[in-house]
C-alpha cells in the first residue's frame, strides 16, 4: 500500500488478547479467518517473539515507542506514557505523513488527540491520566452508539454513563467496536490515499467478555482442547490457585459468590465457568470474536 509519492503507507492493526495459535500460519485450522490467513501468506511471519511485559498498558507502551516499559513510563496499567518519550507518530517526524490513531489507547487520556497523531478516534470513556483535571468528553464510539439508538448500561469512575464492555458485547455485529473501527479506517484511508499516511488501528476484540454477536458460530464440543485444558499448572503460588478458584465459581445466577453483577451478567449470556461445558462455550465464543477481528481486517486491507 503506497501513495503516489512512493513513500510507504503504514497500517498497524492491533487486536487485544488474541493468542498466537488462533491463526492458520501458526497451525490453527478450526477458526474462520480467511483475511488474516491471506495476509499471513503474503507476509513475514514471526515465530520467535516475546512481549516485553504481560500487562496491557506496559506492553502497549513498548509497541508504541520501541522502549521497555520502565523507560516509556507505564510499568502497570493506569500509568500514562512519559511526556518526553516519542511515539511512532512522533518518530516518523515527516510533515508529508498524516498520522491517525483509531481505537483503544490505554496510555493516558483516551479521548484526547495527542502524541503526534493528526487524527484521533477514541473508543473508551473511563481511562483518564488524572481525575483532578475535570471531566473528559465522551469517546467517539460512545457518541456513535448513541446516534445508532443504543443506550449506556453502566457508569464510569466519575459517575457518568458509559457503555460497559459487558453491555457492548450484547450489541449486534454492526455496532461492535471492530465494525466501528472498520468504518473509521476506511474513511481515513479514502481521505488520505493520495498522500503518505500512518494508520494505527487498535480494537478491543477478542478481549473478555468473550461473548459477542457471533456466538454459536463454532461448536464448543468440536474444537480441540489439548492436554492442558482446565489443568492448573504445577508448583504455582497458592494465591494463583485461590484466584483461579474464585473466578471459576461464577455460574448462572448462583449464590456461590456475592458478586451479583458478574453472576447476573454471566446468567444473561448463558455462561458458566464452574463446568467443563461452560469453559468450552467461552472458548468457542472467544474464537468467534477472532472471526469478528478477521472481518475488520478484511475491510481495512
Residue positions per predicted region:
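Formylglycine-dependent sulfatase
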Residues: 1-301
Amino acid at each position: 500500500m503506497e501513495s503516489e509519492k512512493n513513500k510507504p503507507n503504514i497500517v498497524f492493526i492491533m487486536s487485544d488478547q488474541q493468542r498466537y495459535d488462533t491463526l492458520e500460519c501458526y497451525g490453527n485450522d478450526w477458526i474462520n479467518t480467511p483475511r488474516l490467513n491471506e495476509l499471513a501468506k503474503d507476509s513475514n511471519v514471526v515465530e520467535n517473539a516475546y512481549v516485553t511485559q504481560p500487562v496491557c498498558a506496559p506492553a502497549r507502551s513498548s509497541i508504541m515507542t520501541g522502549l521497555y516499559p520502565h523507560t516509556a513510563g507505564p510499568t502497570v496499567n493506569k500509568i500514562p506514557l512519559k511526556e518526553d518519550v516519542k511515539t511512532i507518530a512522533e518518530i516518523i517526524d515527516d510533515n508529508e505523513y498524516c498520522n491517525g490513531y483509531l481505537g483503544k489507547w490505554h496510555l493516558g487520556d483516551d479521548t484526547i488527540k495527542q502524541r503526534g497523531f493528526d487524527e484521533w478516534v477514541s473508543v473508551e470513556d473511563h481511562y483518564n491520566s488524572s481525575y483532578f483535571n475535570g471531566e473528559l468528553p465522551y469517546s467517539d464510539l460512545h457518541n456513535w452508539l448513541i446516534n445508532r439508538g443504543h443506550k449506556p448500561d453502566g457508569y464510569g469512575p466519575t459517575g457518568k454513563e458509559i457503555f460497559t464492555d459487558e453491555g457492548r458485547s450484547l450489541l449486534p455485529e454492526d455496532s461492535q467496536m471492530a465494525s466501528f473501527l472498520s468504518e473509521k479506517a476506511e474513511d481515513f484511508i479514502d481521505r488520505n490515499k493520495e498522500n503518505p499516511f500512518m494508520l494505527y488501528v487498535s480494537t478491543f476484540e477478542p478481549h473478555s467478555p468473550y461473548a459477542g454477536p457471533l456466538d454459536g458460530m463454532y461448536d464448543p464440543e468440536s474444537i480441540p482442547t489439548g492436554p492442558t485444558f482446565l489443568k492448573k499448572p504445577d508448583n504455582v503460588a497458592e494465591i494463583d490457585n485461590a484466584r483461579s478458584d474464585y473466578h471459576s465459581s461464577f455460574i448462572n445466577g448462583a449464590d456461590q459468590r456475592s458478586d451479583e453483577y458478574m453472576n447476573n451478567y454471566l446468567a444473561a449470556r448463558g455462561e458458566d465457568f464452574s463446568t467443563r461445558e461452560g469453559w468450552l462455550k467461552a472458548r468457542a465464543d472467544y474464537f468467534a470474536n477472532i472471526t469478528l477481528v478477521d472481518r475488520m481486517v478484511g475491510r481495512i486491507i
